[in-house]
């Protein structure tokens, strides 16, 4: 089956930052393969002079480089479509969520190590196995790492966990639904998986959406996760596991001895048996483990 790719992109230089359009990957490839973008990237990195800017004026050069960077075409990695082509959070269409995100590595000294570590994580036996989708140098020769989000994990959770595994600081500005990434030239692309910006198979989409819904989130993983009944039970069970039931039984027996005189000893014994049975039932429930659900 043919893999369909979709990308929310503004392919124009000096494009309106509030507008993005849904295209196939050939538009993306056309932009990063253009000579104009290549020249802009070289100028931003100081590899080529900028017309009308004195190379001896460091402040002027820096300002001109920032201006050029702001003029680059851009795309949004989290969603393939925005309502009315307006790039804002509430316009991100949930059904176009791509279940991917981009990690920023802003420390130039760590870029090459991060590339190696990302590849290592991709081949590991943990949750990041097969997660690597894209590696690309940013406009200032830092690093963008595109990854597949583990099933059930939100953008924020994915970013935090991956940054920890990678050994880089977590950046909360990277988790917004409408986040934009400036495009760089083809030579800056280090690696691209065939599943980068791909529409996942319907069965996987449904499984991922359900994993979010089970947590009380929207189908694209937004909102505050609610504590459902199973989670509430888990919390109660955790609390019970901290209780010393032998101490409770001893206290109950002492109270029964004080409350009941010898003629009522039979009643006391019956109550003790009943309480012991209840405590045993609670302990059995505490130690019971719910079977793992396989998707």
Please identify what each model-predicted range represents:
Residues 1-99, 222-225:
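DNA replication initiation on ssDNA origins
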Residues 1-3, 120-134, 164-170:
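Structural alpha-beta junctions
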Residues 6-14, 82-109, 149-232:
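DNA replication initiation modules
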Residues 34-37, 41, 55-61, 111, ...:
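Short amphipathic alpha-helical segments that mediate assembly, nucleic-acid/protein binding
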Residues 105-129:
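Short amphipathic alpha-helix segments
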Residues 133-140, 171-176:
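Short beta-strand
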Residues 141-148:
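A generic structural motif
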Residues 228-295:
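Long, distal/terminal scaffolding or interaction modules
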